């Protein structure tokens, strides 16, 4: 069967759910797709809760690990939705997922209010550059007391203001579960939530005029057709049958031709900044490419190992280190979709860096990463995020 073509008729926005484990992020995602599928059946399909929550690992522990993409449309826009991981161990994935959001829905259970991971996700959203947040106050059907809801709202607004988000951001009272069950009042609450997304997240400005760049998130083989790399196009555009170069991580770059482009299982003639898509590569073996490399217009960007960065070191309460670190500290640096070990050099006269500090540092990575000034990264050790920063100067 020939694949249908993806139609670009509306502005395309990448959105996601973030927030504390068990506050209902995945249920909210499922409710949005169901309510929109019922309201606008010609342009939406409902995604069941267990289709979204589909990583095998998380079934055992009831936590979302992988990042699931679903799509839906309002009358005004087409949305690609990332269900971001909710568990502390998997903040690594939060970093790879959230870097792709034009806005985020922060899901907070009215029964609990903001929890430690709520705070951590908002901090991370700020550090990885999610520009707008609005709030789905979930499980409102379980709280009768208006005063409790008002207190929770105040706490949420304080939390948003702490990270320089709009403290006047919309807070929409929902019950994702009741909406899934078809309760009219709560179905309307999800429609209101999407109206708030349409109104409060501006149409993103895509970096269309720059040369093509797409970080590789995943790689798989289609029997008889070849290797497909998937990711979100960060810059520029690409047509079918154009050549690309794949750079970073490995010692030498590789050139190939893109023989097909797919988005949401539909074939496309071209792809542009903001799209989540798959590129079919001519004559490329799966083992020749890896996550963390980037596909680029040949010669447009170069990989580097040495840079200067401006870094915020997380406090203990934010999930960071309990103790300071010294010169020559060797953590992992997460760029876009991958982590690379690097050695930190502190500025002259700085003996150590305390949790909570802002610091300028130079870094030498053990593998090259395609980067330029302004690129954001997170610093991790083991499962813990210990800092977040951006590249201020390329050294080599």
From Swiss-Prot:
GO terms for cellular component: cytosol. Monomer. One of its GO terms (molecular function) is GTPase activity. It comes from the Bacteria. Its EC number is 3.6.5.3. The keyword Metal-binding applies. Belongs to the TRAFAC class translation factor GTPase superfamily. Classic translation factor GTPase family. EF-Tu/EF-1A subfamily. Mg(2+) binds at residue 26. Residues 175-177 are annotated as: G5. GTP hydrolase that promotes the GTP-dependent binding of aminoacyl-tRNA to the A-site of ribosomes during protein biosynthesis. Residues 19-26 are annotated as: G1. This is Elongation factor Tu. Residues 10-205 form the tr-type G domain. Residues 62-66 are annotated as: G2. Its main location: cytoplasm. It catalyses: GTP + H2O = GDP + phosphate + H(+). Residues 83-86 are annotated as: G3. PANTHER family: ELONGATION FACTOR TU, MITOCHONDRIAL, ELONGATION FACTOR TU-RELATED. It comes from Corynebacterium aurimucosum (strain ATCC 700975 / DSM 44827 / CIP 107346 / CN-1) (Corynebacterium nigricans). Residues 138-141 are annotated as: G4.
